[in-house]
Swiss-Prot record:
Keyword list, A-Z: D-amino acid, Hydroxylation, Methylation, Toxin
List of residues that carry (3R,4R)-3,4-dihydroxyproline: 7
Residues recorded as bearing 2'-methylsulfonyltryptophan in the entry: 2
Recorded coiled-coil stretches: none
Residues the record lists as 4,5,5'-trihydroxyleucine modifications: 3
Protein task: A toxin that binds to rabbit muscle actin with a dissociation constant of 20 nM preventing actin depolymerization, causing cellular and tissue disruption, and death.
Protein name (record): Virotoxin
Length: 7
């Protein structure tokens, strides 16, 4: 999961 933890 990086799209949810990108910012």
């Amino acid at each position: 999961a990086w799209l949810v933890t990108c910012p």
